[in-house]
Each structure stands twice: as C-alpha cells, then as structure tokens.
Amino acid sequence: MKTFSAANAENARKIDPLIRELTSKKVVADVAEFTRLLDSKARESKLQEFLASHSYFFSGMIDVYSPSPLYAKVKLGHDYEVDFAWLYFDSFGPEWRLVEIENPGSALFTKSGEPSSALSHAMQQARDWCAWVHDHAEYARKLMPQISHPLCYIFLGRRKDVTPANREALRKLRYDRRSEIVIHTLDWFVRSGQVFGQCIGPDGPTWQIPMKVLTQRDLKNGLPEEVQDWVAEAQSKMMTERRLDQRRAKWSRDNEPGMFKTDTDI
C-alpha cells in the first residue's frame, strides 16, 4: 500500500497539462468570464458547464493535494442529480461533499428576512440527498465508497444583494444547519478563482485535479487507484486509533479508584 507521501509524490507527476499551462493572466480572464455569466444571470446549466471545465474554481474547498477527482452530474438512483461531488479527507476520515448550483438571479431571503423559495428549495433538496443516502446506504456506497453523512454545499444568488440583516440571518442559518449544509453566494467561486491565480508560482500551479471534471460513468468505474490507497490508509489509521481508544477505556475501567481486584475477586 502506498503511503500518503508516496501518493502525493505520484500525484505531483500527474498534473493535467491544461492545469500546467495556466498562467495568472489566463486565470484573470477565466474569472472575468465567469463574472460576466453571473452578471448576465445566466442559466444554472451555463454555470455548471463553465465550472465543469474549470475545476480549479473549487480550489477553496478541495485540498490542493487531494487525490480525489471532482465529479459532475452524479445521479442518486433515479431520484436526484448532484451537480458536483468529491471525496474529502479530514481527521474524521473520508466523506463526500455534494454541491448544488442555483440561479445567480435568485435572492437568498425575502424582504421580511425569511429564506426565499429558491433557498428553501435548495435546502430541502440537500436534505433529500442525505435522506436518500441513508435510505439506500448499500447502493450509495457502491457508487460513492465511504459515503455516510455527506456535507452539502449550496451556491445561490449574489453577494451584492445580501443586506447586513440577511448576512446575520445567513450566519444563524448556517450555524443551525452546519452538520449538513453550507451556504454561499455564487461570488464565492469568483474569489476562489482570484486567489488561485494569485498563488500560481514560478513552477506553475500545483492543482492536481484534472481541469475538466469527471462524469457519472467515471465514478461508476470506481475511484482511481491513488484514492483507494488513501481510503485504505485512512481506514487503517482509524482502526488503529479505535483499538487504542478501546484499550485506554478498558485500562481506565480496570483501574478505576476503588475497583482494583483482590485475590477473592478472581
């Protein structure tokens, strides 16, 4: 089995040529093009197409050294379709992130400060995704290995339309839903692209995800080998930590004050 460092070294040699060719100037032009789409209130499908051809706009969410590809148009059975998805690795082990792209012309809140119909619909859809994963756990894990409690991202509306009162309501809403939903305006991608361009060094970008995202068919064919290695190593580490926790708990129980065994206890 490869180690994390070995997987990173191998990934570094696999940077997509389209990513290697990126320059700060090209990224500025890409960001301007995406901003024009937002300003023209382009259809969701147009935004999805652009993002599917410019994976680095997700660089603020996906670890730069992540081995997981970014997938688009992932179908959850015959019921739902997720705009984008990837497998995320953190201290708690691997878990999936699911993304819903909504209309840039939609408001986040009504004039009375309540979640708009567009935001309410998007949040319900995210909850439906999570419910589907739980109700079809075996099937879901065949498609997306390790999926259990996915975190759903919603991108909707524009930052300029968010009032101070809306901002406070959004903070509360995000806190209340933090275990299952994260909400951003579509301008989040603009900022992510800008930061990516500013971070391009003399050796070029270090973004290891293909420029053009993968598809449902790719996902059905299984995770790439390096991702499977990361999953296996993460599971091994978690099992080792779990065994250590169990041993510590047993030691604590066996050595609790007043509970030491005597010869007559044996």
PLM regions with names:
Residues 1-266:
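Charged, terminal alpha-helix-loop-beta segments
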